Each structure stands twice: as C-alpha cells, then as structure tokens.
A protein has these predicted regions:
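Short alpha-helical DNA-recognition segment
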Residues: 16-34
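Short, charged recognition helix plus adjacent turn
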Residues: 9, 29, 34, 41, ...
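A short, Lys/Arg-rich alpha-helix, primarily the initiator
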Residues: 1-16
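The alpha-helix within a helix-turn-helix
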Residues: 11, 22, 52
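DNA major-groove recognition helix of helix-turn-helix/homeodomain DNA-binding modules
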Residues: 46-61
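Residues within the helices of the helix-turn-helix
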Residues: 8, 19, 49
C-alpha cells in the first residue's frame, strides 16, 4: 500500500513553481519538497485545504492510493 503525491503534476498543469505554491500555502519550500517526494508521514487537513485552494483542485488530484 502506498500513497502517491501528485503535486508536481498539478504544478505543471497550473504553470506554477514550487516556490510560488509554498508561498501561497504558507509552508516552507523544504516542507513542500518533503511532501512532493513522498517522504512526509502525514499532512494536516488545513495544509491539504490550502494546497487544493492554491492549485484549484480536489484532494484526489493531489493524493492517489496504489495497492
């Protein structure tokens, strides 16, 4: 079981940089990098909400479950 984080896909679709996203969401570039590489062990709902608002997407566009 694994959760795949597709933030890079959404960044490309929105033509946005990681730095721009981190600033809009209110997290550090380092924390965004940890999330993007799948090394994060958890994500707060408030952070997920901010990501979805900044990227104009749904949680399922960012997170994917693979068995």
């Amino acid at each position: 079981m694994s959760i795949i984080v597709n933030v890079d896909v959404m960044l490309a679709k929105r033509k946005m940089t990681s730095g721009e996203l981190a600033e809009k969401v209110g997290i550090t570039a380092a924390n965004l990098s940890i999330l993007k590489t799948g090394k994060a062990r958890a994500i707060r709902f408030t952070t997920l909400d901010a990501l979805c608002k900044a990227l104009d997407c749904q949680p399922g566009d960012i997170l994917e479950y693979r068995d």
